[in-house]
């Protein structure tokens, strides 16, 4: 497929952006380092701010390495943000809260952070998982020792609670899985109580779990999709039933369901495995990028094998659509030799949201011939006009390719690179990394932060794979970035919250900000460092509705 590759007050300190004149790079009040990601030429991103860097300590609680899956919500006027850390079970990450009273120590865990939404100041940190209700040992050999938590998700309340019937629970959960061993364990942590439950229905699927994502829909049925990067290399659909009684995980329908494999069919014939060159087709048929799917029972033997299915997400306003990306491998070796690869973005569209067992259709929206390399993490969000977009993050591994963040517009079928790993640290093709950093880095964890930091804000993290002393293990950083264009608006939409139009409220905001900018201001539209007549001219040029 040929495609066109095309919070306001929180950025309180400014550094010159290396590429795009309008981009501001900010060291947040709690971070010891400038942002690990920067814009590319022509980026729609206005501001990037670092929130926490590995090694930073808040009230004695330290940010440890290999941050991966994330989610957040508001508690009062503060943001509660949660991160899972992708440590091996043997990692000396210290004795965690959920290991209190046992002989276990270290491994993967879940950290929580309280953050000011207006300044990005981190107020405190804590272990979010405080006890376990697991029933089998993982690769760490203990009930309370976890290995390689990867992508994660904090589902919307309606995913686990039906307000109409009262079934389910309004407790917030963090769901993630072990991307290690067969089977890895799928873990749902009750963020209200700190109890981590094992979703045993996923055990028979023998997954190395990248993520488990619950559908955001009012229903008595709990639907969740698990992606297995390794092990079965398949995509599984969990179907459970919400209850009126039991512990919070039981009420949520997380412990009584069944997992089914996605079985892709083309022309009514089962597709056993995705192909690097031909996708859902074969050498005899040539490339095929769409088909149908059914749900197959039978544990690890059920369904189509994909090329390392990674992260996935539901369309927030369309519970029939689920998007997932597969990683596969790079289009070149580390030495630069060309090789076939098939990193793709797929959409599953269920025929009946009230009966997911009825199957649906599958389509490769990005078919492996695009600029995306080893797509790993993603988020799906809706624009101000109701369109659907996908942010995709790359994990090129130990390769000179700089890990990128890309934005895909489903309606226009356009793909744009917006961020890259800082080449001054991590290097790039033809450019060596700067010690202690290396070319082995991964962008991860991205989510739409409109409900916490405001419309136009997104949060991501960086895994920087160079060794640090225990308990840090490896480097990394938590960061946020701001772009009204990604929400379908434009830079002249400066009044907060952005609304997709340029009108008197934006002029009023610009006049309030008029003069020299002492920090990032959305009103400094042209990035000159001063809110002046040039910015006013841009607002007048964009007067009316603006579309990003």
Language model features with spans:
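Generic hydrophobic alpha-helical membrane-segment signal
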Residues: 6, 204, 299, 433, ...
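Intrinsically disordered/low-complexity terminal segments and short unstructured peptides
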Residues: 1-6, 226, 240, 515
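Cellulosome-associated attachment modules in secreted, modular CAZymes
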Residues: 487-548
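Sequence/structural signature of beta-propeller domains
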Residues: 22-487
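A generic structural micro-environment signature
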Residues: 6-12, 57, 354, 424, ...
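Gram-negative bacterial Sec-dependent N-terminal signal peptides
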Residues: 2-21
């Amino acid at each position: 497929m040929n495609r066109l590759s095309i919070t306001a007050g929180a950025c309180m300190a400014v550094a010159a952006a290396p590429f795009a004149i309008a981009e501001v790079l900010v060291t947040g009040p709690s971070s010891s380092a400038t942002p690990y990601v920067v814009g590319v030429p022509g980026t729609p991103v206005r501001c990037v701010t670092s929130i926490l860097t590995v090694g930073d300590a808040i009230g004695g609680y330290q940010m440890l390495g290999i941050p991966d899956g994330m989610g957040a919500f508001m508690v009062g006027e503060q943001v509660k943000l949660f991160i899972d850390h992708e440590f091996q079970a043997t990692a000396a990450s210290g004795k965690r809260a959920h290991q209190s009273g046992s002989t276990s120590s270290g491994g993967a865990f879940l950290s929580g952070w309280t953050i000011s939404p207006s300044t990005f100041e981190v107020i405190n940190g804590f272990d979010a998982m405080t006890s376990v209700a697991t029933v089998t040992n993982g690769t760490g050999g203990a009930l309370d020792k976890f290995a390689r938590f990867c992508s994660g998700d904090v589902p919307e309340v309606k995913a686990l609670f039906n307000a109409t019937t009262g079934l389910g629970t309004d407790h917030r959960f963090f769901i993630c899985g072990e991307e290690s061993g067969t089977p890895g364990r799928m873990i749902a942590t009750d963020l209200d109580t700190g109890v981590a439950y094992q979703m045993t229905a996923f055990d028979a699927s023998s997954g190395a779990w990248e993520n488990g994502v619950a559908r955001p829909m009012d229903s008595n049925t709990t639907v969740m999709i698990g992606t297995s990067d390794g092990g079965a290399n398949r995509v599984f659909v969990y179907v459970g039933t919400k209850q009126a009684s039991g512990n919070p995980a039981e009420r949520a329908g997380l412990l009584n369901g069944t997992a089914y494999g996605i079985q892709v069919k083309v022309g009514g014939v089962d597709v056993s495995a995705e192909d690097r060159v031909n996708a859902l087709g074969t050498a005899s048929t040539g490339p095929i990028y769409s088909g149908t799917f059914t749900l197959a029972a039978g544990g690890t033997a059920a369904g189509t094998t994909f090329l390392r299915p990674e992260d996935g997400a539901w369309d927030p306003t369309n519970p029939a659509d689920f998007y997932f990306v597969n990683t596969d491998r790079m289009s070149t070796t580390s030495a630069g030799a060309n090789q076939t690869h098939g990193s793709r973005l797929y959409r599953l569209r269920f025929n009946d949201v009230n009966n997911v067992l009825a199957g649906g259709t599958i389509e490769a929206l990005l078919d492996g011939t695009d600029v995306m390399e080893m797509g790993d993490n993603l988020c799906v969000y809706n624009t101000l006009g109701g369109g659907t977009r996908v942010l995709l993050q790359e994990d090129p591994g130990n390769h000179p390719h700089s890990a990128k963040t890309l934005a895909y517009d489903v309606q226009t079928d356009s793909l744009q690179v917006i961020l890259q790993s800082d080449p001054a640290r991590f290097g790039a093709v033809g450019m060596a990394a700067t010690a202690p950093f290396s070319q082995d880095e991964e962008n991860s964890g991205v989510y739409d932060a409109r409900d916490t930091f405001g419309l136009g804000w997104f949060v991501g993290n960086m895994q920087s794979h160079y060794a640090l002393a225990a308990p840090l293990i490896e480097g990394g950083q938590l960061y946020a970035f701001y772009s009204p264009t990604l929400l379908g608006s434009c830079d002249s939409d400066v009044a907060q919250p952005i609304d997709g139009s340029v009108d008197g409220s934006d002029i009023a905001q610009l006049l309030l900000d008029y003069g020299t900018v002492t920090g990032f201001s959305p009103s400094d539209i042209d990035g000159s460092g001063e809110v002046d007549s040039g910015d006013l001219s841009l607002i007048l040029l964009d007067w009316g509705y603006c579309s990003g």
